[in-house]
UniProtKB/Swiss-Prot annotation:
GO molecular function: translation release factor activity, codon specific
Keyword Cytoplasm: yes
Gene name of this polypeptide: prfA
Residues recorded with modification N5-methylglutamine: 234
GO CC field: cytoplasm
Gene3D superfamilies: 3.30.160.20, 3.30.70.1660, 6.10.140.1950
Modifications after synthesis and translation: Methylated by PrmC. Methylation increases the termination efficiency of RF1.
PROSITE patterns: RF_PROK_I
Name under which the protein is recorded: Peptide chain release factor 1
Length: 359
């Protein structure tokens, strides 16, 4: 794996020269790609420099120890540091998910459990908004359908990052959140104090950055307009401002009613539609790839029950990684990093295993 480092170091130097070219910054799309790749390679360059320096230090300590026994005590510590640096570099050389630097569109939907599920969907939204705030990401609610008790039947939010580094990207962290989230607690509507189990679904898809990336033929779109409605189905607008867009080739349907303007709802709908079409295209690519390649690209299953939130025990458990902690109150306030990190580490391990199998 380390044989490729020399080529990456050369690529990093070439990108550094490109970043100094004023013409690059005139092309926003190309500039963004170069900056992201440069940020990604900068981590590898720094890790390689650390690994090389520690190797030199260890070699020097061994040589000096032959003449002066005082240097013998330094060798075990340097060996341990070198092993850690090598493992760090090894992980950085794992091929990244090409979408890691992208922003995302997240959809949270109530599932089994009725009103309690809708309230849990609202709790999940609050958790993700607080998590985004802690990472200084920007959020925008695109569409929402509230339930009678103040929860959400469905809510869509766009989450935008602030870094070109793929390792800090929104998709790199939130792609593991897609799936069924189960909650165990006493519902607000429960008079007997019994614990109920309900669930909400989360869908996370990378956002399209350029319109040209996912071209949509107007002839492939069926657009309906209607009056927006609130909880219970009552109309909240006197004009046909809500928009429903159907992509005929794929059957994907997007409905938007959050804005008072039909034009704004249409623009938001097209934004979500492009992301969903892109996600479908990626699914088809993954399906055609070999089993090993699929595991390298997307190793975490996001289609099944992924996590349980047990409020009476203040416990959160991720069923994919085995992560468990008794700080659910903090997690629901946005302290999601340890949970996400467990997913990232499990993903890296799976990718390393896949590379070993492929070799």
């Amino acid at each position: 794996m380390f044989e490729s480092v020399v080529q990456l170091l050369e690529e990093h130097e070439e990108l550094q020269q490109q970043l100094g070219d004023p013409e690059l910054h005139a092309d926003a799309s190309r500039s963004r790609k170069v900056n992201r790749r440069y940020a990604e390679l900068s981590r590898i360059v720094a890790a390689h420099a650390e690994w090389t320096q520690l190797g030199d230090d260890l070699a020097a300590a061994r040589e000096l120890a032959e003449e002066d026994p005082a240097f013998v005590d330094e060798i075990p510590g340097l060996e341990e540091q070198l092993d850690q640096a090598q493992e760090k570099l090894r992980r950085l050389l794992i091929p990244r998910d090409p979408d890691d630097a992208r922003d995302v569109i997240m959809e949270i939907k109530m599932g089994e459990g009725g009103a309690e599920s809708a309230l849990f969907a609202a709790d999940l939204l609050r958790m993700y908004l607080h998590y985004a705030e802690s990472r200084r990401w920007k959020t925008e609610v695109l569409s929402q359908t509230q339930s009678d008790l103040g929860g959400y039947k469905d809510v869509q939010v766009a989450i935008k990052g602030t870094s070109d580094d793929p390792a800090l990207g929104v998709w790199a962290h939130l792609k593991y959140e897609g799936g069924v989230h189960r909650v165990q607690r006493v519902p607000a509507t429960e008079s007997q104090g019994r614990i109920h189990t309900s669930a909400a679904g989360v869908l996370v898809i990378p956002e399209v950055e350029e319109v040209e990336e996912v071209p949509l033929d107007p002839n492939d779109l069926k657009i309906d307009v209607y009056r927006s409605s609130g909880p219970g189905g009552q109309s909240v607008n006197t004009t046909d401002s809500a928009v429903r867009i159907t992509h005929l080739p794929t059957g994907i349907v997007v409905a938007m009613q959050n804005e008072k303007s039909q034009l704004q709802n249409r623009e938001a709908g097209m934004r979500v539609l492009r992301a969903r079409v892109l996600a479908k295209q990626q699914e088809e690519i993954d399906a055609e790839a070999s089993a090993v390649r699929r595991s390298q690209i997307r190793t975490m299953d996001r289609s099944e029950r992924i996590r349980t939130y047990n409020f009476p025990e203040n416990r959160i458990a991720d069923h994919r990684t085995g992560y468990k902690a008794y700080n659910l109150d903090a997690v629901m306030d946005g302290a999601l990093d340890p949970v996400v990190e467990s997913c990232i580490q499990a993903d890296e391990e799976a990718r390393l295993d896949a590379l070993g199998t492929d070799a």
